[in-house]
Amino acid sequence: MSDNIIFMGTSKFAVPILEKISESKLNISAVYTQPPKKSSRGMRIQKTPIHVKSELLGLPIRTPNSLKNNNDEYNFIKKIKPTIVLVISYGQIIPKEFLDLSKNGFLNIHASILPKFRGAAPIQRAIMTQDIETGISFMKINENLDSGPVLKTYKIKIDLNLNATDLEKKLSQLAALKIIENIDSIISGKANFKEQDHSEATYAEKIIKQRGRYFGMRVPRKSLEK
């Protein structure tokens, strides 16, 4: 019997990774994504990029509003007994009691070189602070924000001509390229997770735009206009 996984994701960042897994020997038992929402103009219901892609791939989809105090989803995952659960740009907190439901835990791909830029907007912060490099981190989820042990990090240089959308695409493609080998190392028992240096942690808070201005960090104008 092939190893089965549960995939939790929402944004475009997670789509190439889901595609890569669907092409592998792994069995995707379920895809979790955020529920469909009304578009900004309120005229139509809009599904997430992962929802749309999962439908095209014929994958089973679940869209709970929240996992908190959700016995139905807890029991569903418990029954599946997933080999591993992947959480990539999902947009929901994973309750502590869920973390023991998978044989190999919950694996997250975070778009920074942890422990730098934990939080919601690591890609935007890397551009705002004019960093010369960034990357992705394969991390086991624990009960605290982006603070779990790290399996692997992969770095790339930040081209000054890239905007946040371009950089997100590059990091997503990198994650898709590396996802299968990292899952395989975990399933085979060869994975070597290392604790983060929490004293070096920095945070990438969500960026809020109001009346043409960005709040949360002072940055050069040219960085925001890219």
Predicted regions and their residues:
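One-carbon transfer enzymes
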Residues: 1-226
